């Protein structure tokens, strides 16, 4: 006897499933997120599951790890070295990659640019649920994409998409976007928790069985998280986030999950009329246009994975026009900024209690490593005292609650990047001096300091 469909309630935020409705999700605690959905019988979906009977048979026998052949493991280079860096060396066969970001950030653009390079030798199937084939052609023309092996499919029915993949057998599949795909057998609208989960599963199974890499575009919700169930991020092999303000040209591509590489790498791009242009020297780009002999600005060296990056920190302290002073931070943790302000008042005698304090990381970067603490403090104190930090100085170090400076990692990489871009002075924690070979950096004056007061004196002398 065929199984019957049943009504369930699924949280649109976390994907929690319940047999009855509730105002508050028992799992994530969000209110008014439980949505009614019809759970379709397994038999109704089996035709579009993405598995063939032969593929299932092959996967049923356990294999000894020594029997598994990995000699033919191959990565497709995308033509964008910055993207390859984030992916861990390129696209792995049979992998499922999710690219997410705000609307207009460049997700579809980067897919078409990948098509232009890979499409010279490989067959690519580009599936769009948001645009017609004509619209994609017009956008591709603007970007200069004219690959002979690129096939466009404007379709939202995932069952038909899987069928086309099995028929065409492309080398790479791109889905733009996963939230527009739907199962016609499911009684829920595209983009719902059930639809997103089942459509992703179908594409994943098809991709794995045919050993075809697939790139999915994912929308984000108002909080910046990927729209749909959290299980979506567990299904895919890699999750890449595009960061950056649409009003600015810089874009940061960051991996938050990667089964085939590091999650500490970033790729830096510049969005222009001709699409995304990769920036292979991001430090120089981030510091372009930096004001000279101006108070409230400080250069620091941060580590993004194995890549050292110079960034400009800007601080502003000004008289408050309200009873309660305002605090605002862009690109740096607000709570960490408040902690640094408290340390400056208590341990160094720089008072911000009656002043508004603003902090900005230039270029749209988001920095969360403790090594930036000292640069944040120096930028704010420089603005408070209206005393410029020397233009040839790079600052980094972690600040403790006693006002002391703690050592940070990758000292030599940070100093090397600063020296490469012409900086001749580095103010760093005194204890970090032991881990650096000063003979390698004869052209850089290394100044070890014990606390924030010493650091400020060293920065302005």
Give the positions of each predicted feature:
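Peripheral, non-AAA+ core regions of ATP-driven protein-machinery
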Residues: 2-13, 17-85, 92-100, 105-116, ...
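Conserved RecA-like ASCE P-loop NTPase motor core of nucleic-acid helicases/translocases
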Residues: 124-128
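Conserved Walker A/P-loop ATP-binding site and its immediately adjacent core
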Residues: 129-135
């Amino acid at each position: 006897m065929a199984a019957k469909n049943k009504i369930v309630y699924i949280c649109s935020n976390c994907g929690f499933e319940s047999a009855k409705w509730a105002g508050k999700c028992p799992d994530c605690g969000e209110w008014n997120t439980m949505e009614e959905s019809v759970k379709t019988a397994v038999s109704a979906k089996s035709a579009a599951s993405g598995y063939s009977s032969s593929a299932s048979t092959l996967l049923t026998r356990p294999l000894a790890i020594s029997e598994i052949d990995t000699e033919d493991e191959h990565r497709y280079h995308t033509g964008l070295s910055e993207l390859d860096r984030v992916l861990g060396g390129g696209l792995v066969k049979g992998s499922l990659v999710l690219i997410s970001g705000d609307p207009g950030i460049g997700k579809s653009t980067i897919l078409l640019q990948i098509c232009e390079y890979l499409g010279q030798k490989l067959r690519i199937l580009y599936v769009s649920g948001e645009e017609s084939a004509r619209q994609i052609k017009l956008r591709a023309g603007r970007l200069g994409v004219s690959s002979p092996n690129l096939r466009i499919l404007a379709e939202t029915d995932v069952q038909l998409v899987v069928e086309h993949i099995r028929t065409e057998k492309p080398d790479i599949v791109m889905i733009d976007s996963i939230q527009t795909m739907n199962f016609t057998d499911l009684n829920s609208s595209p983009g719902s928790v059930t639809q997103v989960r089942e459509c992703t599963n179908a594409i994943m199974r098809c991709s794995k069985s045919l050993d075809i890499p697939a790139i999915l575009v994912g929308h984000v919700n108002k909080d910046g998280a990927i729209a749909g169930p959290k299980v979506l991020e567990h299904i895919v092999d890699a999750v890449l986030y595009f960061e950056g303000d649409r009003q600015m040209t810089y874009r940061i591509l960051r991996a938050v999950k990667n089964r085939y590489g590091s999650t500490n790498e970033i790729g830096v791009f510049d969005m222009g009329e001709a699409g995304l242009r990769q920036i292979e020297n991001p430090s120089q780009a981030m510091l372009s246009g930096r004001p000279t002999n101006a108070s409230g600005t400080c250069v620091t060296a941060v580590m993004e994975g194995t890549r050292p990056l110079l960034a400009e920190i800007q601080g502003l302290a000004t008289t408050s026009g309200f009873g309660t002073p305002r605090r605002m931070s862009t690109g740096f943790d607000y709570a960490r900024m408040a902690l640094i302000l408290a340390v400056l008042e208590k341990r160094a005698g720089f008072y911000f209690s009656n002043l508004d304090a603003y902090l900005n990381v230039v270029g749209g970067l988001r920095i969360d490593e403790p090594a930036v603490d000292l640069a944040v403090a120096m930028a704010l104190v420089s603005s408070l005292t209206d005393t410029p930090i020397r233009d040839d100085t790079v600052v980094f170090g972690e600040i403790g609650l006693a006002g002391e400076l703690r050592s940070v990692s990758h000292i030599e990489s940070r100093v090397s990047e600063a020296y490469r871009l012409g900086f001749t002075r580095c103010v760093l924690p005194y204890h970090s001096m032991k881990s650096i070979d000063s003979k390698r950096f004869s052209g850089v004056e290394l100044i070890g300091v014990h606390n924030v007061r010493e650091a400020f004196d060293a920065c302005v002398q």
